[in-house]
């Protein structure tokens, strides 16, 4: 019998500057060590933190950029099975409507950069981001979609659409 994997709940926040470039973090720690990713982090489940509260907190902690819940649009919820073979993730993906004004200073988790969407296609990013999260962002960032992804190691990521709001 395969041992059960833990389930983690987290947010990703897609931030842009006024030029439409995306803020990404070159991660210096797992998960996603050594690759570029949107900012985010785990919910503080012990205090009953909501995904919106977590997105606001993580944005402030990682970038120093102050946002409010009404600056956020929840555009996707994705259940990732067996991510990196380590755990399952329930991810809430937010687009921040408020442009970030400047590149944040480096933090313990890594260093920041602004990138156009075309430049991101050439960056070292997690395979799940390349094949699932960024295509989801491109297609649904102004709507809402619920998906699940099988991220088992050694196999291509399989994404299944479970629900979508009408356009």
Language-model region placement:
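Conserved N-terminal beta-strand and adjoining loop/helix that marks the start
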Residues: 1-23, 43
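A short coil-to-beta-strand element that immediately follows conserved catalytic motifs
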Residues: 66-76
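Conserved hydrophobic/aromatic beta-strand scaffold that supports enzyme active sites
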Residues: 14, 24, 91-95, 114
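NUDIX/MutT-family hydrolases
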Residues: 95, 104-136, 157-167
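Short, solvent-exposed loop/turn elements at beta->coil junctions and helix N-caps
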Residues: 1, 75-83
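Conserved Nudix-box catalytic region and its N-terminal flanking loop in Nudix hydrolases
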Residues: 21-61, 157-167
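Active-site-adjacent beta-strand/loop module that shapes the phosphate/pyrophosphate-binding cleft
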Residues: 19, 80-103, 130, 134-140
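Short connector loops at helix/strand junctions that flank enzyme active sites
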Residues: 8, 38, 67-69, 86-91
